């Protein structure tokens, strides 16, 4: 059978990334509480294509992914090596976006329920391996200005903290989530009984946060941790009294 993809191309244009996207695929990720957790990822996989080759072999990306048993740092690097080998490429790229569930107990009644956190792993490899881990954590914020100027109450809302890191040493997804939650006015819970709802309401009121406050607290906690070498943080507040949202953004390196 003629291999059309492997035909010579005379245009001499190398392609930085060519591959597949929006592949929904079952994966197993590492879970601090239960060792592993099965979820569904939306995957992008790509490779560099040399200028003298007409096309890539798309099915080989899926073949490489199908060999993956658990998605962790070492396994992702091995996957990129397989993609490079199967596609005869100098550089490979992969991204997994997936929901991750963390079992949480409420603060008063200790009711157990899962909280969904959207996560992603993004990695590439040529001669060097580069991995970024991201979490998008829902939290609760209460406005310090609204509290200060009001005789009672204050506007409050859900916010989302996106933390993306390059690590020096391994960290659990749960640990990144805990950094975001500890920096907010209050964590979120899927189930709240009335005593829990009272606690959450009062906790947020006692701990007001602007998006700027929340972002700075996240950065301070990451610097104190010692296992992170680079970070990107994006905080978005879904404003409850405005027809717009508020946000704050930062990225940087941690050299110590």
UniProtKB/Swiss-Prot annotation:
The keyword Hydrolase applies. The record marks 143 as: May be catalytically important. Its EC number is 3.5.4.16. GO terms for molecular function: GTP cyclohydrolase I activity. Pfam families: GCHY-1. GO terms for biological process: tetrahydrofolate biosynthetic process. Keywords: Hydrolase. It catalyses: GTP + H2O = 7,8-dihydroneopterin 3'-triphosphate + formate + H(+). Pathway: Cofactor biosynthesis; 7,8-dihydroneopterin triphosphate biosynthesis; 7,8-dihydroneopterin triphosphate from GTP: step 1/1. Belongs to the GTP cyclohydrolase IV family. Converts GTP to 7,8-dihydroneopterin triphosphate. This is GTP cyclohydrolase FolE2. It comes from Caldicellulosiruptor bescii (strain ATCC BAA-1888 / DSM 6725 / KCTC 15123 / Z-1320) (Anaerocellum thermophilum).
């Amino acid at each position: 059978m003629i291999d059309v993809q492997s035909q010579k191309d005379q245009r001499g244009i190398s392609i930085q990334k060519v591959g597949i996207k929006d592949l929904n695929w079952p994966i197993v990720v590492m879970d601090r509480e239960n060792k592993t957790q099965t979820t569904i990822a939306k995957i992008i996989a790509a490779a560099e294509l040399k200028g003298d080759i007409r096309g890539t072999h798309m099915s080989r990306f899926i073949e490489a992914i199908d060999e993956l048993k658990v998605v962790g740092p070492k396994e992702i690097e091995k996957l990129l090596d397989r993609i490079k080998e199967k596609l005869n490429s100098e550089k490979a790229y992969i991204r997994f976006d997936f929901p991750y569930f963390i079992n949480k107990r409420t603060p008063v009644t200790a009711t157990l329920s899962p909280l969904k956190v959207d996560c992603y792993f993004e990695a590439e490899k040529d001669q060097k391996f580069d991995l970024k881990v991201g979490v998008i954590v829902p939290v609760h914020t209460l406005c310090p200005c609204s509290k200060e100027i009001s005789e009672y109450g204050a506007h409050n809302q859900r916010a989302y903290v996106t933390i993306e890191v390059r690590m020096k040493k391994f960290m659990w997804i749960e640990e990144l989530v805990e950094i975001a939650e500890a920096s907010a006015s209050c964590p979120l819970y899927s189930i709240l009984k009335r005593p829990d709802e009272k606690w959450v309401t009062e906790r947020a009121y006692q701990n007001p946060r602007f998006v700027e406050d929340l972002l700075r607290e996240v950065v301070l906690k990451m610097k104190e941790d010692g296992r992170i070498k680079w970070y990107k943080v994006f905080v978005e507040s879904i404003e409850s009294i405005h027809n717009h949202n508020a946000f704050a953004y930062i990225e940087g390196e941690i050299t110590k």
